Amino acid sequence: MLRWTVHLEGGPRRVNHAAVAVGHRVYSFGGYCSGEDYETLRQIDVHIFNAVSLRWTKLPPVRPAVRGQAPVVPYMRYGHSTVLIDDTVFLWGGRNDTEGACNVLYAFDVNTHKWSTPRVSGTVPGARDGHSACVLGKIMYIFGGYEQLADCFSNDIHKLDTSTMTWTLVCTKGNPARWRDFHSATMLGNHMYVFGGRADRFGPFHSNNEIYCNRIRVFDTRTEAWLDCPHTPVLPEGRRSHSAFGYNGELYIFGGYNARLNRHFHDLWKFNPGSFTWKKIEPKGKGPCPRRRQCCCIVGDKIVLFGGTSPSPEEGLGDEFDLIDHSDLHILDFSPSLKTLCKLAVIQYNLDQSCLPHDIRWELNAMTTNSNISRPIVSSHG
């Protein structure tokens, strides 16, 4: 019984950030926030959400080991990717308005909170943003995005073997997925499932004739071939900047945006790779408002969703150029316990808590007390 169980405000106000779950914690890296100074080059920030205490913390800036020497830290960026392999978060790609796009690989140790730049070899992908990254074993797969130097969309697949730190441009077989950015790629078993994103009628080149494909594409990592997929009768609307995650062997997508329809979404869809069918899911409880550019991470049987941007609710500010960046966080529970359901009832009906054990009262307080590290709301345009 899927249910939205937690909604808290006051976290990091971010869009186009990247995040990974490490145990019961979620690490969020960078992103964009309207009103912040992006002309000054500065370190990427790291926020950590504790899924037990439901609190956010922010790591302090990295100090140089040698006075006068800049520390090895990625610059603040958006449209990048992060994956977790063992105890290391690998951050790749992304851009900011001063430095442009980046193709340097960064490694973040979740135990020491230290950054490094591993020495890599092979065919390094060109600098880009809006790509996807997913993991199979020790290998990170990068697909698509918008390449800065070529000034075009990509449909290449690169893989990084983190045991040897070797990049490889995959020579794929079959009919490849269309050039795109801000799509999703999710690894289920040995297959990478690509959905959505922004493409163009002129192929790799951006002409403002956007296409939002809603057919899923599947890449087999064993044969390195794009598979021919059957048509499905029920499909979600095409979209970009949505979230996707795998749970119990199935693929889920949430939210996103379609510029041709000028519509933000807050729907949840489930894809079954066995039957190759989509189903719209209607969780219980109050979920997030329509949005794009948010992050989703799996923590046990829960999905932690935070950030993103939505149309301003103010009158006359409804189009895509008037957006409000979010500092909220929502938790979607795939299997809420009886204890969780009882706590939700206490909150909903404002029941007396004085007779409850201290730990239950602490948990109720955590579920209803907002964080306080977000910036003030500023309307963004774009």
Swiss-Prot record:
Q: Where in the cell is it found?
A: Cytoplasm
Which keywords does this chain's UniProt record carry?
Cytoplasm, Kelch repeat, Meiosis, Repeat, Ubl conjugation pathway
A GO molecular-function annotation: chromatin binding
Q: Which domain of life is it from?
A: Eukaryota
Repeat Kelch: residue ranges?
A: 25-77, 88-138, 139-189, 191-249, 251-301
A GO CC annotation given for this chain = chromatin
Pathway recorded for this protein: Protein modification; protein ubiquitination
Please name the GO terms of the biological process aspect recorded for this protein, alphabetically.
meiotic cell cycle; proteasome-mediated ubiquitin-dependent protein catabolic process; protein ubiquitination; ubiquitin-dependent protein catabolic process via the C-end degron rule pathway
Query: From which residue to which does any coiled coil extend?
Result: none
The record's note on quaternary structure and interaction partners says: Component of a CRL2(KLHDC3) complex, also named ECS(KLHDC3) complex, composed of CUL2, Elongin BC (ELOB and ELOC), RBX1 and substrate-specific adapter KLHDC3. May form oligomers as a KLHDC3-ELOB-ELOC complex; this interaction is likely autoinhibitory for the E3 ligase complex.
Record PANTHER family: KELCH DOMAIN-CONTAINING PROTEIN 3 (PTHR46461:SF1)
State its role.
Answer: Substrate-recognition component of a Cul2-RING (CRL2) E3 ubiquitin-protein ligase complex of the DesCEND (destruction via C-end degrons) pathway, which recognizes a C-degron located at the extreme C terminus of target proteins, leading to their ubiquitination and degradation. The C-degron recognized by the DesCEND pathway is usually a motif of less than ten residues and can be present in full-length proteins, truncated proteins or proteolytically cleaved forms.
> What is the recorded name of this protein?
Kelch domain-containing protein 3
* Gene name per UniProt: Klhdc3
